[in-house]
C-alpha cells in the first residue's frame, strides 16, 4: 500500500495472543509479562483451559492495559488442551460457542469490559478452516450472538471464499498471520510434525512479523513467494524467549513508518 507520494504506507498490524490458558493450580503462559505488548487478548473460556477465576483475572489484566478482549472458545477437551477434533453436529457447535462466549462476556460485563471479537481455538479453529460447512456454522453462531463481533481466522493465499461467506452471513472477518510459523504455498501452516514448522530464532520471528506488516511476501516451504493479507498477527507468550520475541516485535512494528 502506498500514499499519494508513492511512499509505502504501513497499516497497523494488531498483535493478538492466547491468554488465560491456566486452569486451577496448573499454570500456562506468562500473561502478565506479555499483556503490555499486545493489542488483543484471546481469552480461554473454560473448555480447553481457563476457569472462572482465571477468566476474571485475565479480563482484569487486559482492561488494566487497554487490551481488546476476544473470546477463545474450543471443543470441550481439557485433557487434550482443545487440540483434538470432535465429531460435533452444527447444533452442538453453536451451543458450545454461545456457552463459552456468553460466559466470558458476562465476566467482562461485571468488570466494565466487553467481548469484542471471537477466535476459535486449536482443533475447532483448524476444522473451521478446513471445512466450509463448519466455517458457516461458526459464522452463523457468532451472528446469532452478536453480528457486530468479528471472527478471527487464518489468512491464506486466497481469502476470497471466506470473505464471501462472512459477507453473506453478515459477520466481519479479521484475518490473522503467524510470525513464528512456516507456511505452505497455499498459505496454510506447515504441520508441526515437519522440521522447520516453528521458527525458534527470535530474529527470524521479528523479520517475518515486519515483512507481514509491510505487506511483503514470505518464502513458502516449496520456495515460492507467498502473499498474505492480514489485519492481525498471532504471537505467543509461553516462555521467557517468546516473551522477549513479542517485545522485539512490538518495538519493530512501532518503529515502522505509518
UniProtKB/Swiss-Prot annotation:
Family membership: Belongs to the LamB/PxpA family.
Organism: Pseudomonas putida (strain ATCC 47054 / DSM 6125 / CFBP 8728 / NCIMB 11950 / KT2440)
GO molecular function, one term: 5-oxoprolinase (ATP-hydrolyzing) activity
UniProt keyword Nucleus, yes or no: no
Key word Repressor present: no
Name the UniProt record assigns to this protein: 5-oxoprolinase subunit A 2
Superkingdom: Bacteria
UniProt record, GO biological process: carbohydrate metabolic process
Keywords: ATP-binding, Hydrolase, Nucleotide-binding
SUPFAM superfamilies: Glycoside hydrolase/deacetylase
Gene of this entry: pxpA2
Catalytic activity: 5-oxo-L-proline + ATP + 2 H2O = L-glutamate + ADP + phosphate + H(+)
Listed Gene3D superfamilies: Glycoside hydrolase/deacetylase
